[in-house]
Amino acid sequence: MDDGIGKTIKLFLLWLGLFLALPIIGAIVGRFFTSPANYEILKWSQLLGYVLMIIIFFGKRFVELSFGHIERRMVRPAVGMSVLIAASQAFVLFSALSLLDVDLQFQGEELERRQRLVSGIAGILNACIFAPIGEEICFRGIILGGLLKTRCRTWIAILISALVFASFHGFGANFVTAMLFGILVGWLYWRTGSIIPGIIIHITNNSLTAIDISNQTNIFYLIILVVGLVLLAYGVWWFWKKAINDSATS
């Protein structure tokens, strides 16, 4: 086995252990309590797991927290462009799905369970901050970063990391949207050599779910779709042409 692949697998297993261990303990302890206390225990155990994950992977430099190939004078604009890309891709996907009449919402007990898990302080922190950071550590920092260090072709590596990312986010339309998101953020990671744009985009994307633009007219969604596509294209073009000193990456 290639040393790079072996290291990637080991880091992924470490990440998976941290991702699962404390929430499993929290779920077991929570069985001795009634709702909503059991959900609070689970949410705080998830948060602690993410915090430990972040400390270990960034502290040990298993995943590098830097701006990579982004020129120093372009760091602030890169942050702004990351937010722009996050907002534009979110509105593009939502408006396209609305025009196609595709519902991403879970139903019944599963919907209620997920709503409870993202409510309260711990739930909001998990959904909007710590889960995005933890997922970027894994899917871009570990998997994509590891594959790019091997003989794997760039787009194959991006597609593999996006596929694994999507598999963690359900099936059907949720899988497709997560796959597209993973390809976009994976390309940015390859282009910049940095996990930071992906973290910013992921945090912004998850935070935007609090904005409700459902039950609008098709004209509204069409306008949002067109504007979003233009802004998204500009953001991608900016990272391709403006943010990087190509002589530093060659």
Question: Which residue ranges define each predicted feature?
Answer:
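N-terminal, membrane-interfacial amphipathic/helix-forming hydrophobic leader that caps
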Residues: M1-V75, A87, T204-S250
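Alpha-helical transmembrane segments and their helix-entry boundary regions
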Residues: L11-F12, Y39-L42, A78, I142, ...
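Juxtamembrane helix-loop-helix connectors linking adjacent transmembrane helices
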Residues: S35-P36, L65-G134, G145, K149
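Membrane-helix interface segments
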Residues: N38, M74-R76, G120-I121, R151-I156, ...
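Structural signature of hydrophobic alpha-helical transmembrane segments
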Residues: K43-V51, G123, I133, G170-F175
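Residue-level signature of the transmembrane alpha-helical core
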Residues: V79, V83, I124-I129, I133, ...
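Membrane-interface helix/loop boundary segments of multi-pass membrane proteins
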Residues: G134-I160, W187-S194
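Functionally important transmembrane alpha-helices
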Residues: G172-G228
